[in-house]
Amino acid sequence: MTSIAIDAMGGDFGEKPIIEGVIQALKEREFKAILVGDPQKLKTLIPQELNSYIEYEEAFDVFAMDENSTDALKRKDSTIYKAIDLVRNQKAKAIVSAGHSGATMSLATLRLGRLANIARPAIATLMPNIHSRTLVLDVGANVDCKSEHLFQFAIMGEAYAKEILKIAKPRVALLSNGEEECKGNELTKETHQLLKQLPNFVGNAEGRDIFNGTIDVLVCDGFNGNILLKTGEGVASVITKLLKQEIQKSFLAKLGYLLAKPAFNELKTHIDYEEYGGAPLLGVKECVIISHGKSGPKAIKNAIFQALNFTQSNINQTIEKELSNYEIN
C-alpha cells in the first residue's frame, strides 16, 4: 500500500480541512496516510473505521506563511521538515503540503535532491482552457531563469503531460509578448532557439493563448508564471461575482439561472482550482505536491490523488531519459 506523508497542520485554516480531505480521499482510494503534526489534535478528527489506514508522525512546529523560508533547514521539528524526511527515509512515497511553499520547495530540493541534469526544480500547475487544461511551469519556484532552465522546464512539462495527463504528443509553447520568433526579451529569444530542438514545440504563445486550447504545456519563468496564475484566478473570481450580481437584478435573470444551473455548475467545476488539488514540484527525486494555503477538503483530496498518480508513473525516469537526448550547453 502506498504511503503518503501529509503536512497536517500547514494550511491557512489549520488541521481540520486537511484531515477532512484525507478522509474523503481514503473513502475513494486505498493508501496509507502518515499525518505529520500534533497526534493529540489529529486523532480526534479521524473516524475509527479509518484508523488502520492512518499513522502519525509527531511534530509541533508549524511554519507560518509570513516566516522566512531560509530558516527551513534549521527547524527540524517543523511539520514540513519531518514530512519531507519521511520521503527521504523511504517511509513514504510522496508528500502533500498546503503549508509554506517556499519552505517546502527549499527542503525538497536540499533534502531529496534534484534529478540528473536538472539545475532548477519548477512548480507546475494546471490552468483551465476552453477544451481541457494547460500545464504551466514555472509558477513561482524561480523568479530569475536562464534559457537552459526554461528548456529543462519544457522537458519536465512535456514528460508530465505524457505520463500523468496521458497526452501522446503535448504541444509545448513559450510565453512571450508575441507569436513571432523575433518577439520577447533576450531570455525568451535564447530559449526559443533551444526549444526548436523539441519535435512538439509550437513556438511562442501570448498570455491569452493559454485559455484557447491550442497548447498543452506553457513554459515561462516563475515570476511571469505566478503573475499569469494569479491573474487567471482573479479574473475567474470577478466573473463569478459579476454573474451573481446580475442574476439578482431581476426575476427573469433568476429564472434563467435556474434553467441554466447545470451549465453554471459545469463551468464552476471547470475553473475551480480545487479540482486540481495542488501543483507538483518537478525536478526533485521524489513526489512533492504543493497545495494552496487556502485549500479546502476537496483540494486536499485531489492533491492526494495527484500524489498517488505520480508515484504510479515513470515520470522522473522519463524526464532524465529525455534530457539525456539533448545538448543545451
From Swiss-Prot:
GO cellular component, one term: cytoplasm
GO BP terms, alphabetized: fatty acid biosynthetic process; phospholipid biosynthetic process
HAMAP family found in the cross-reference section: PlsX
UniProt protein name: Phosphate acyltransferase
Pathway assigned to this chain's UniProt record: Lipid metabolism; phospholipid metabolism
Function: Catalyzes the reversible formation of acyl-phosphate (acyl-PO(4)) from acyl-[acyl-carrier-protein] (acyl-ACP). This enzyme utilizes acyl-ACP as fatty acyl donor, but not acyl-CoA.
Annotated family: Belongs to the PlsX family.
Keywords: Cytoplasm, Lipid biosynthesis, Lipid metabolism, Phospholipid biosynthesis, Phospholipid metabolism, Transferase
E.C. designation(s): 2.3.1.274
An example molecular function term from Gene Ontology annotations: phosphate:acyl-[acyl carrier protein] acyltransferase activity
Catalytic activity entry: a fatty acyl-[ACP] + phosphate = an acyl phosphate + holo-[ACP]
One of the Pfam families matching this protein, by short name: FA_synthesis
Subunit structure: Homodimer. Probably interacts with PlsY.
Record's keyword annotation contains Nucleotide-binding: no
Cell compartments where the protein resides: Cytoplasm
Enzyme class: transferase
Annotated organism of origin: Campylobacter lari (strain RM2100 / D67 / ATCC BAA-1060)
Keyword Nucleotide-binding belongs to the record: no
